[in-house]
């Protein structure tokens, strides 16, 4: 086997790396093209409301599929200011039975409108410091248009219909924010 000698701060002068992986002649299992084409994967919706810090990597891993060429994400984070006030953190509360039900409806609506494979909606509850994610929505699909449109629909509809409340915590005060996009708060 050929090898490459590397000298850098990461390796000693004697480090040798293979240029190609070793060949394994007698593989225990070699999937045929037919096996790979017939892979059927059940679609899934993963919904989670949690006080734990959200991870973009963990949420995006939930929607990966060999049948899909696109994963679209929306990540909402706490910004450090609002109308000239310094924001320290946000605090979220939700009416969980209704919130979970409404998010399930959003997932169902998405599946009626676009050919998507997997959907994950994670929303943080409790305190969310500046720069941390409060919501992550991930959608996978065969092609990008479906997942991009589905993610946009998901965040817009979530803000309009899901009973989640946000308190902005400033340096010297705090205030519960009304969601202007929420259907039950509109004056019409």
Swiss-Prot record:
Disease annotated for this entry: Molybdenum cofactor deficiency B: An autosomal recessive metabolic disorder characterized by neonatal onset of intractable seizures, opisthotonus, and facial dysmorphism associated with hypouricemia and elevated urinary sulfite levels. Affected individuals show severe neurologic damage and often die in early childhood.
Function: Catalytic subunit of the molybdopterin synthase complex, a complex that catalyzes the conversion of precursor Z into molybdopterin. Acts by mediating the incorporation of 2 sulfur atoms from thiocarboxylated MOCS2A into precursor Z to generate a dithiolene group.
InterPro entries recorded: MoaE_sf, MOCS2B_euk, Mopterin_biosynth_MoaE
Pathway the protein acts in: Cofactor biosynthesis; molybdopterin biosynthesis
Subunit structure, as described in the record: Heterotetramer; composed of 2 small (MOCS2A) and 2 large (MOCS2B) subunits.
Keyword field: Cytoplasm, Disease variant, Molybdenum cofactor biosynthesis, Phosphoprotein, Transferase
Cell compartment(s), UniProt: Cytoplasm, Cytosol
Species this chain originates from: Homo sapiens (Human)
Root EC class: transferase
Note: This protein is produced by a bicistronic gene which also produces the small subunit (MOCS2A) from an overlapping reading frame. Expression of these 2 proteins are related since a mutation that removes the start codon of the small subunit (MOCS2A) also impairs expression of the large subunit (MOCS2B).
BP GO annotations: Mo-molybdopterin cofactor biosynthetic process; molybdopterin cofactor biosynthetic process
Tissue and organ expression note: Highest levels are found in heart and skeletal muscle. Lower levels are present in brain, kidney and pancreas. Very low levels are found in lung and peripheral blood leukocytes.
GO MF term set: molybdopterin synthase activity
Identification of the protein by name: Molybdopterin synthase catalytic subunit
Gene3D superfamilies assigned to the protein according to its UniProt record, in alphabetical order: Molybdopterin biosynthesis MoaE subunit
Keyword Cell membrane set for record: no
Modification Phosphoserine, positions: 20
Family: Belongs to the MoaE family. MOCS2B subfamily.
């Amino acid at each position: 086997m050929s090898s490459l000698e590397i000298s850098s701060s990461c390796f000693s002068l004697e480090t040798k790396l293979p240029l190609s992986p070793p060949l394994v002649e007698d593989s225990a299992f070699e999937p045929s093209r037919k096996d790979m084409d017939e892979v059927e994967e059940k679609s899934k919706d993963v919904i989670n409301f949690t006080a734990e810090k959200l991870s973009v990597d963990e949420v995006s891993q939930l929607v990966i599929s060999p049948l899909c060429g696109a994963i679209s994400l929306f990540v909402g984070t706490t910004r450090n200011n609002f109308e000239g006030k310094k924001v320290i953190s946000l605090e979220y509360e939700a009416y969980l039975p209704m919130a979970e039900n409404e998010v399930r409806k959003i997932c169902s609506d998405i599946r009626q409108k676009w050919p998507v494979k997997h959907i994950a909606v994670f929303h943080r509850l409790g305190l969310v410091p500046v720069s941390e994610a409060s919501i992550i929505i991930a959608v996978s699909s065969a092609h990008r248009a479906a997942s991009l449109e589905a993610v946009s629909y998901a965040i817009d509809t979530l803000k309009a219909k899901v009973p989640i409340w946000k308190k902005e915590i400033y340096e010297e005060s705090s205030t519960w924010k009304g969601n202007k996009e929420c259907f039950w708060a509109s004056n019409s």
